[in-house]
């Protein structure tokens, strides 16, 4: 996977966390930069670890399905991208109803894990491709740190407008990467 695909994947994977951070930022009266950075660090750390875990799980099965690697990555990315798009079109969830208060550490960790399950599944798919998983996981984590911090800071201003659109954009990016993987396999 080339650098462009890695960066697109990283920012595509960060869109769930970005959308969640916008929601979190929108529930706080005036989120401070330190609160936003704390959220970004938690989301980024979790989002760095989950593709590594998924990659490890995928490597255990790689020798059995190596000839199907491009199809596995394609189907996973299409599925995850489609799920993100569907979530983006759904109405506001209970998370938007939280009181305006500082979010606790464990609530942020739980939210980060929930938004990073896609990254774990992508990690499984990446096990079947020739990628530097450490660099890819770090790119995903850094993109998530940036996008989550940014999402918290702008959440109170645009939470109701762009929150779900960010998930739609992330889903489209994942689908695009899936199509690119399949295209590259067949057209070299």
Swiss-Prot record:
Periplasmic topological domain: 24-65, 129-142, 188
This protein's UniProt keywords: Cell inner membrane, Cell membrane, Ion transport, Manganese, Membrane, Transmembrane, Transmembrane helix, Transport
Residue ranges annotated as Cytoplasmic topological domain: 1-2, 87-105, 164-167
SS bond list: none
Keyword Transmembrane among UniProt keywords: yes
Membrane-spanning intervals of the chain: 3-23, 66-86, 106-128, 143-163, 168-187
Domain of life: Bacteria
Known role: Probably functions as a manganese efflux pump.
Family: Belongs to the MntP (TC 9.B.29) family.
Phenotype of the disrupted gene, per the record: Deletion causes manganese sensitivity and leads to increased intracellular manganese levels.
Membrane topology type: Multi-pass membrane protein
Primary location class: membrane
Location within or outside the cell: Cell inner membrane
Molecular function per GO: manganese ion transmembrane transporter activity
GO biological process, one term: manganese ion export across plasma membrane
Species whose genome carries this gene: Escherichia coli (strain K12)
Originating gene: mntP
Keyword NADP part of the UniProt annotation: no
Inducers of expression: Up-regulated by MntR in response to manganese.
Protein name per its UniProtKB record: Probable manganese efflux pump MntP
GO CC aspect terms: plasma membrane
């Amino acid at each position: 996977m080339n650098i462009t695909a890695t960066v697109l994947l990283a920012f595509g994977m960060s869109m769930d966390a970005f959308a969640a951070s916008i929601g979190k930022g929108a529930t706080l009266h005036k989120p401070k930069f330190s609160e936003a950075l704390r959220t970004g660090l938690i989301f980024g750390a979790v989002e760095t670890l989950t593709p590594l875990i998924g990659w490890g799980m995928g490597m255990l099965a790689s020798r059995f399905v190596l000839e199907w690697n491009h199809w596995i990555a394609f189907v996973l990315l299409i599925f995850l991208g489609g799920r993100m798009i569907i979530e983006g079109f759904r109405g506001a969830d209970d998370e938007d109803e939280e009181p305006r208060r500082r979010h606790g550490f464990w609530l942020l960790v739980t939210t980060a894990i929930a938004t990073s399950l896609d990254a774990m599944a992508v990690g499984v798919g990446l096990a079947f491709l020739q990628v530097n998983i450490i660099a890819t996981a770090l790119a995903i984590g850094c993109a998530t740190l940036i996008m989550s911090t940014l999402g918290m800071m702008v959440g109170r201003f645009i939470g109701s407008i762009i929150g779900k659109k960010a998930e739609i954009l992330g889903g489209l990016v994942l689908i695009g990467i899936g199509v690119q993987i399949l295209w590259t396999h067949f057209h070299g």
